[in-house]
Design a protein with these regions (language model features):
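Short sequence motifs at beta-strands and strand-loop junctions characteristic
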Residues: 34-36, 62-64, 96-99, 122-124
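Feature captures outer-membrane beta-barrel proteins of Gram-negative bacteria and organelles
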Residues: 39-48, 66-79, 99-111, 126-137
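Short glycine/proline- and aromatic-enriched beta-strand/turn motifs that initiate or cap beta-hairpins
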Residues: 17-60, 67-69, 133-137
Length: 137
């Protein structure tokens, strides 16, 4: 594991166009009532290449509990201020399981991002989440 981390750091140091972002998690909309829509939290996202990035952080989830997340993201479209991608990773802090796999599409324009997370349980909800993505380097 430490070799993998060292390789990632080495590769990210070699890429001059890589950027790091502060993620400010903030709000969500659910298609069913009873869920928390104020999802404050912070995260870090780092570009590994023109199309690949990794991210991790914490937020207050839709069940009013603390969650940590980590994911890899592939940006399949980057033009002007648009950045469209697909992310795959894992999240903690939900009642359903201690760690839940996740995959979601995300659309960013300038600093504003929106993601869509589909319902995973019959009694759950589809959710659209919103956050800011601010360059810090």
């Amino acid at each position: 594991m430490k070799y993998l981390m060292a390789l990632c750091l080495l590769l990210s140091a070699q890429i001059s166009m890589a950027e790091t972002y502060l993620q400010i998690n903030g709000a969500s909309w659910h298609d069913r009532p009873g869920y928390n829509s104020v999802n404050y939290g912070l995260g870090i996202e780092h570009e590994l290449s023109e199309h690949w990035s990794v991210a991790g952080g914490w937020y207050r989830n839709s069940e009013y509990l603390g969650s940590t997340y980590a994911y890899g993201r592939y940006a399949f479209y980057k033009q002007d201020q648009w950045n469209l991608g697909i992310a795959v990773g894992a999240v903690t802090g939900y009642r359903r399981a201690s760690v839940i796999p996740m995959a979601f599409p995300e659309a960013c324009y300038a600093w504003a991002c929106a993601l869509f997370a589909p319902r995973v349980e019959p009694t759950g909800a589809n959710v659209v989440g919103f956050r800011l993505r601010i360059p810090i380097d």
